[in-house]
From Swiss-Prot:
Enzyme class name: lyase
Function of the protein: Expression of pVip15 in E.coli (strain MG1655) confers resistance to phage T7; prevents culture collapse upon infection. Catalyzes the conversion of guanosine triphosphate (GTP) to 3'-deoxy-3',4'-didehydro-GTP (ddhGTP), probably via a SAM-dependent radical mechanism. The modified nucleotide represses transcription from T7 RNA polymerase-directed genes (possibly by acting as chain terminators), strongly suggesting these nucleotides block viral polymerase transcription.
Domain Radical SAM core, first and last residues per copy: 3-221
Organism of provenance: Coraliomargarita akajimensis (strain DSM 45221 / IAM 15411 / JCM 23193 / KCTC 12865 / 04OKA010-24)
Pfam families, per the entry: Radical_SAM
EC number: 4.2.-.-
Protein name: S-adenosylmethionine-dependent nucleotide dehydratase
GO molecular function: 4 iron, 4 sulfur cluster binding; lyase activity; metal ion binding
Metal-binding recorded as keyword: yes
């Protein structure tokens, strides 16, 4: 029997992003709202929290985008989700993280996921993983990770494996960063989102496997490595668009449910295809353990420390 809703939802609160990653599939081209109204966002959170007994408790909400930190109310929204008893998670490119914001998120944000597709400035520029300034450096990533962890926020990393970063070796960085999990996605094609020039980024299954195997040794450092093929990503995520609708990506496109605030979260979710077995198989349920510091994460002479902008 299909669950009422998945135990984790990806709540895409905003379309805008300060980066321009060319293979991004979260542009929501058919979405008629740029930023989710806060009243709708909080209503969706309330409905989601009310169903946690049907899936897993505490249920988890991933705040995503676009770049969710561009929303002027993202800290307030995370705090509201936390007040409902939800596990809170933020997926960000990390460029807007500051000590001031991390101070506000301390005790409210359970999991910080930073998307890092390359450690090479030239590759990041070619991908579009930059804004008007230079891409983040290795030392800047490590500084953000350390400052989050010392505030009691667990850190996870995401990487999209594609044609440009396929031969990169990130082992030393991951060992130093010590995320609780490192998720590796094979670059995913979504029709009408990133399909126009997808061949420029696409890789073969065996190339993805080689990238994963090259990095298996990070597991000996206590990092959980989680690879996801395209097949594992289709139909296994509870995705909510900025206009408050579930998205069905099971057929390689985005098909939208009715608005949750109009029909209710259970009825809206019934309109999309979701595989709970697939969700579990890809490791969708896992423990988040906070740590205040990690001796493996030290800023070395090779990567001189840079302070965050307050």
């Amino acid at each position: 029997m299909k669950p009422a809703i998945p135990p984790t939802i990806n709540l895409h609160t905003i379309r805008a992003c300060n980066y321009g990653c060319k293979y991004c599939f979260a542009g929501f081209q058919d979405c008629d709202t740029g930023v989710m109204p806060q009243a709708d966002l909080h209503e969706i959170l309330r409905q989601f929290a009310a169903t946690t007994g049907m899936a897993i408790h505490p249920a988890k909400v991933n705040f995503a985008g676009g770049e969710p930190m561009l929303s002027p109310t993202f800290v307030e929204d995370i705090c509201y989700a936390k007040s409902l008893g939800l596990t809170t998670s933020l997926v960000t490119n990390g460029s807007l993280l500051s000590e001031r914001l991390l101070d506000k998120l301390s005790g409210q944000l359970d999991l910080l996921t930073i998307s890092i597709d390359s450690l090479k400035p030239g590759t990041n520029r070619a991908i579009g993983r930059t804004n008007r300034q230079n891409p983040l450096t290795v030392s800047e990533y490590l500084d953000r990770i350390l400052k989050a962890r010392t505030r009691g926020i667990t850190v996870k990393l995401n990487t999209v494996v594609n044609r440009l970063n396929l031969d990169e070796d990130m082992t030393d960085f991951i060992r130093e960063a010590q995320p609780i999990r490192w998720k590796l996605f094979k670059v995913l094609k979504i029709q009408n989102e990133n399909s126009a020039h997808f061949d420029s980024w696409a890789i073969r299954d065996e190339e993805f496997v080689h990238f994963v195997e090259r990095h298996r040794k990070v597991e000996s450092s206590g990092v959980t490595l989680v690879p996801e093929s395209n097949e594992q990503m289709y139909g296994t995520y509870g995705i909510i668009s900025p206009d408050g609708r579930f998205i069905d990506n099971s057929q390689g496109t985005h098909r939208y449910s009715p608005r949750i605030v109009d029909v209710g979260i259970t009825q809206a979710f019934a309109d999309v295809n979701f595989s709970m077995a697939g969700f579990q198989q890809r490791g969708g349920i896992y423990s988040i353990k906070r740590s205040t510091t990690n001796r493996s994460l030290q800023t070395s002479a090779l990567h001189p420390k840079r302070e965050l902008t307050k």
